[in-house]
Amino acid sequence: MTQSLEFDQTFGFIAKVLQMIGYPSCLAPYPTTFASRLKSSAGFVVCFLMLTYCVFGQIINIGLLMMGHRQTDQVVEEVAIQVSSTGFCIIGLAKMYSLSYNRAILSWLIADFRVKWNAGELTDKDRSIRDGTLRPTVAITTVAALGNIIMVSAFNFQPVVEMIYGRVVTGEWVKLFPYVIWFPFNSTHGAIYYLVYLFEVYSGVIVAVGNVGFNCIFCLLTSHLSMQLKLLCSWIEDMVEVEDEKGVQSKKKLYRIVRYHQDLIRGRNALQSMFSTTLFLNFSASSVLMCMQLYLITTAGITLMVKFTLFMLCILMEIFILCYYGEEILANSSSIAAGAFNSNWYQSKVSQQNPRFGKNLIPIIQQGQRPMVLTAWKFWPITIRTFSAILQTSWSYFTLLKTVMH
């Protein structure tokens, strides 16, 4: 028999991943004082400032490229590479800011879901629904986190491979960096080179962990909400008991269901408040980033093609997973109205003893007919249809860019 899943196991891995960039454990209580919050987030603040400088340095470098102050034979390709890297860093910066700014909301959501997870009245059927929903999500978020770590490792250590290859072929060391960032000093001089290289390597880790940490937190929270919606639908369908001739137990279940449904609506509103703006930026930028990657894949050599393809796949996986879990909330909230109607309230003695029982179901049915939809800044519903729209937009941008360049 499979061991029951513990609540802390659902967030445990991603909490440890986020601690790599100094983010306090999302499973820990929210600090009550400003001093304690600042102390627990000191490492995260340092990482945020490091990534902020990387964005600043890359923007300056793009400006130098476009003004012709940097010598290169392929200006368009270099600018595309820089824009892709800078865009990804800006998204990571926005997600890190969102995690920090909304830490109180995150703590409240996790505490609320923990109480519901450990509720004593859950049956074996309820626990089966609970574990069956969350186990795949934990596995998916783990794979997504590892995939992003592999991607950033490829970016971080590709220059090392190129330098070794150049040494073997030409007999000379040519100092390279993972990313092209402007510094107000000679970054290739002596020991400074190694310090700058380490700075860029860790900055790559910061942006990857910031991105995937935000995404995984979103997926886990939405999966918890989807699971609660599945439980609610199951309770609604089993609400009416045939043996309950006076309808006492059925009425108690109905009142519990109404309160539970209201709690889930508040949870959905908290998720919307926490993720809406950042996901709008993410979806908007991803269309441009995927366009850039498609262009670079068609123009780059074999070595760079592998790197750009890996980057492209990570972006695709990220957007698909976000939209998939948004779709899950839409689908499970839509089933509530059908569950209320299928509870057989009209065939039982409950409706005969208490004619108002059926009328009390009307608000649940009406609310269920307005499904919960998470949106990216009230512009994009977070659904599979939006994922398809982003792909179509990216392809349109790519074909336009190819036409202009040729």
From Swiss-Prot:
The UniProt entry lists membrane topology as: Multi-pass membrane protein
- Keywords on record: Membrane, Olfaction, Receptor, Sensory transduction, Transducer, Transmembrane, Transmembrane helix
Q: Summarize the impact of D8E.
A: In allele C, allele D and allele G
* Compartments in which it is found: Membrane
Judging by the UniProt lineage, the source's domain of life is Eukaryota
Spell out the molecular function terms from Gene Ontology: odorant binding; olfactory receptor activity
- Outcome of swapping K402R: In allele C, allele D, allele E, allele F and allele G
Extracellular compartment: which residues? 65-78, 158-167, 298-301, 392-406
Q: Signal peptide span per the entry?
A: none
Question: Which BP terms from GO are recorded?
Answer: signal transduction
The UniProt entry lists the main location of this chain as: membrane
> Keyword GTP-binding, does the record have it?
no
Q: Which residues lie on this side of the membrane: Cytoplasmic?
A: 1-43, 100-136, 189-276, 323-370
Provide GO CC annotations from the record: plasma membrane
Membrane-spanning segments: 44-64, 79-99, 137-157, 168-188, 277-297, 302-322, 371-391
Q: Changing H406R: reported impact?
A: In allele C and allele G
Which InterPro entries does its entry note?
7tm6_olfct_rcpt
What further fact does the record state? Answer: Expressed at much higher levels in mosquito strains that preferentially bite human compared to 'ancestral' strains that prefer to bite non-human animals.
Protein's job:
Odorant receptor that specifically recognizes the human odorant sulcatone (6-methylhept-5-en-2-onesul), a volatile odorant emitted at uniquely high levels in humans, thereby playing a key role in mosquito's preference in biting human compared to other animals.
Family affiliation: Belongs to the heteromeric odorant receptor channel (TC 1.A.69) family.
Name recorded for this polypeptide: Odorant receptor 4
Per the UniProt record, the source organism is Aedes aegypti
What is the primary gene name for this protein?
Answer: GPROR4
